[in-house]
Amino acid sequence: MPPKGKSGSGKGGKGKAASGSESSEKKAQGPKGGGNAVKVRHILCEKHGKILEAMEKLKSGMKFNEVAAQYSEDKARQGGDLGWMTRGSMVGPFQEAAFALPISVLDKPVFTDPPVKTKFGYHIIMVEGRK
């Protein structure tokens, strides 16, 4: 009798362990999948005058990546694309602005106006995605 009871509880234990590991896997994925991240592009200029020129180009209808390639002093070859950035991986003012912006597209960007000042210089930021 006792061996049957043990094997019975053993099966139940295995079932619980399997479902337990599944839920722990979901928990492990939860923060990554639900973690706040934005797909960011920016134009970075050290000089305020240069960033204002870039802002005028954007307002005149130029695509964000083209303005970034022409004006940005960082990541210009990628059209200002910084890729996916998570909370805590950006400097304070940049992060606040990035998470406040709506998602937009290169030919009709919604960007920070006025530019955001950080220790790196002045940024015009746009967001292409959020997850």
From Swiss-Prot:
The modification Phosphoserine is found at residue 19. Gene3D superfamilies: 3.10.50.40. One of its GO terms (cellular component) is spindle. Its EC number is 5.2.1.8. Phosphorylated. Phosphorylation occurs both in the nucleus and the cytoplasm. Phosphorylation at Ser-19 does not affect its PPIase activity but is required for nuclear localization, and the dephosphorylation is a prerequisite for the binding to DNA. The unphosphorylated form associates with the pre-rRNP complexes in the nucleus. It holds the Pfam family Rotamase_3. Residues 1-37 are annotated as: Disordered. Residues 1-25 are annotated as: Necessary for nuclear localization and DNA-binding. The keyword Isomerase applies. GO terms for molecular function: DNA binding; peptidyl-prolyl cis-trans isomerase activity. One of its GO terms (biological process) is rRNA processing. Its main location: nucleus. It catalyses: [protein]-peptidylproline (omega=180) = [protein]-peptidylproline (omega=0). Residues 1-41 are annotated as: Necessary for association with the pre-rRNP complexes. Keywords: Cytoplasm, Cytoskeleton, DNA-binding, Isomerase, Nucleus, Phosphoprotein, Rotamase. It is found in: Nucleus, Nucleolus; Cytoplasm, Cytoskeleton, Spindle; Cytoplasm. Residues 35-129 form the PpiC domain. Belongs to the PpiC/parvulin rotamase family. PIN4 subfamily. Found in pre-ribosomal ribonucleoprotein (pre-rRNP) complexes. This is Peptidyl-prolyl cis-trans isomerase NIMA-interacting 4. It comes from Bos taurus.
